[in-house]
From Swiss-Prot:
Organism: Vanderwaltozyma polyspora (strain ATCC 22028 / DSM 70294 / BCRC 21397 / CBS 2163 / NBRC 10782 / NRRL Y-8283 / UCD 57-17)
Protein name, as recorded: Golgi apparatus membrane protein TVP38
Superkingdom: Eukaryota
Known function: Golgi membrane protein involved in vesicular trafficking and spindle migration.
Membrane topology reported for the UniProt record: Multi-pass membrane protein
GO-annotated cellular components: Golgi membrane
TM region(s), chain numbering: 77-97, 119-139, 144-164, 233-253, 268-288
Domains as described in the record: The VTT domain was previously called the SNARE-assoc domain. As there is no evidence that this domain associates with SNARE proteins, it was renamed as VMP1, TMEM41, and TVP38 (VTT) domain.
Family note: Belongs to the TVP38/TMEM64 family.
Signal sequence segment: none
Keyword terms: Glycoprotein, Golgi apparatus, Membrane, Transmembrane, Transmembrane helix
Record localization: Golgi apparatus membrane
């Protein structure tokens, strides 16, 4: 009996080891990482800390490469060029950061004196609200660099962001509705939030969507595919979240202060303030996102139960 038990135990561990190796082989080849299968293989509680780090790293790299090679050739070229430019700018910033900061301060002071600057900023912020445009965070931080934490800066951001979002949503809800549906299908996170919006499309839920870590312009277009979301609720949801724009103004003002001061301690304080602000914003956004995912899972489970109940067979039925 002991021999049989040991044989069964050995066979059990061999099977587990084989399944574990097979999973990582599939992981390397990109198999088994679809939206429906991704969460089925996260039982990594029995892995060591080092194995978990390696697992998460390999998973992240694989997902990035899968998404990258799924793009059109011209999109991959643009992404590579953009990544190269960001790397060059980061290197230049590291080497010539003092000169660059002083130049930014001079330019911001000049732009602040021009009457046309608010109009230009509102226009640019308005247009980056349309997918696939990018640059909302950059323009918002630039506004903070020019006007600091001020009512004028907040009004510029609020007008551009709210009007741009509403117009983008209206366009994709009506004329470009098919394109909006494709935007939702591009990301399962969008699909999850779309399911929640179909259950509850109040402006509070839409405000929560704006606080989650989703691309700004893509969110405006994707929500247009959700049935039942009104322009009124979408507008109110965006207005509610306009205080969030003060964060961009704060970051811009700290960057400007770093260029104006000569004190190393003051620069370090400003840099730490920026990092802590970004970290707090990121943590808040991800907490909200994971709570949203939990609610989405509850809706999925409830839908499964309802479907199962609908398919119950009458035991008295005879053929």
């Amino acid at each position: 009996m002991a021999d049989n038990y040991e044989a069964r135990t050995s066979s059990h561990y061999d099977n587990n080891a084989t399944e574990f190796d097979d999973y990582f082989n599939e992981f390397d080849t990109g198999i088994g990482l679809g939206p429906d299968d991704e969460d089925d293989f996260l039982d990594i509680y029995n892995l060591s800390p080092r194995q978990r780090v390696v697992y998460q790293f390999r998973r992240t790299v694989n997902q990035f490469l899968s998404q990258y090679y799924a793009l059109e050739p011209w999109q991959r070229i643009l992404l590579a060029i953009g990544g190269g430019l960001i790397g060059i700018l980061a290197l230049l910033m590291l080497i010539f950061h003092n000169k660059i900061l002083h130049k930014l301060v001079e330019m911001s002071n000049d732009l602040k004196e021009k009457w046309s600057t608010p109009i230009v900023l509102v226009t640019l912020i308005f247009f980056v609200a349309f997918p696939p445009m990018i640059g909302f965070s950059l323009l918002s931080t630039t506004t903070g660099l020019i006007y600091g934490i001020s009512f004028k800066g907040w009004v510029i951001l609020a007008i551009g962001a709210v009007t741009g979002s509403i117009c983008s949503f209206a366009l994709f809800k009506t004329i470009l509705h098919s394109r909006a549906e494709k935007l939702i299908q591009m990301n399962r996170r969008f699909a999850a939030f779309a399911s929640i919006l179909q259950e509850n499309n109040s402006y509070w839920i839409l405000a929560l969507l704006r606080l989650c870590p989703f691309p700004y312009s893509l969110t405006n277009g994707a929500v247009g595919a959700v049935y039942g979301v009104s322009i009124k609720n979408f507008a109110i949801g965006n207005i509610i979240t306009t205080p969030k724009l003060l964060i961009y103004l704060f970051i811009g003002s700290r960057i400007k202060n770093m260029g104006e001061t000569e004190s190393s301690a003051s620069k370090i304080f400003d840099l730490v303030s920026i990092l802590l602000t970004v970290l707090a914003l990121g943590l808040t956004a991800w907490v909200l996102y994971f709570k949203t995912q939990k609610r989405y899972q509850q809706l999925q489970d409830q839908s499964t139960i309802n479907t199962s109940n609908d398919l119950d067979i009458d035991q008295n039925f005879e053929i």
